Amino acid sequence: MEPITQAFAQQFSREWIDAWNAHDLDRVLSHYADAFEMSSPMIVQIAGEPSGRLCGKDQVGAYWLKALRMIPALHFEWIATLAGIDSVAIHYRGANGRLALEVFHFGPGRRVVKAFAHYAE
């Protein structure tokens, strides 16, 4: 796989933020491999999963749907996008204005295979 370019990273982040702001889970999930793994402190709080990890579009999609129902005015404000060799990091302001950074690792077909969410207090 070719290294990720800044152009790809910017396009991915725009599409990802736009899909979330539209509350369109199908569009959000279209960026992910079927068996991707998500790690987030919010999984503990919202999904009740003590490990903070969920696997697969079904589990993560159900968690995200629950989050959207809990926070119906959810809106992300993009701050920055950073490109790595096989990863993209998006820095944004999320729910309740909280700073967030998500790191996405890409696999075949430029689909996310692992995602890691980080939040400020």
Q: Where is each model-derived feature located?
A:
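Short, low-complexity N-terminal intrinsically disordered segments enriched in polar/charged residues
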Residues: 1-30, 34
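General secondary-structure edge motif
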Residues: 8-9, 40, 44, 84
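A structural signal for well-ordered alpha-helical scaffolds and beta->alpha junctions
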Residues: 9, 13, 25, 57-64, ...
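A beta-strand edge to alpha-helix "cap/lid" segment located at domain peripheries
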Residues: 1-3, 61, 65-121
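Short glycine-/acidic-enriched loop or helix-start segments at secondary-structure transitions
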Residues: 6, 48, 101
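A solvent-exposed, acidic/Ser-Thr-rich amphipathic alpha-helical stretch
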Residues: 27, 33-79
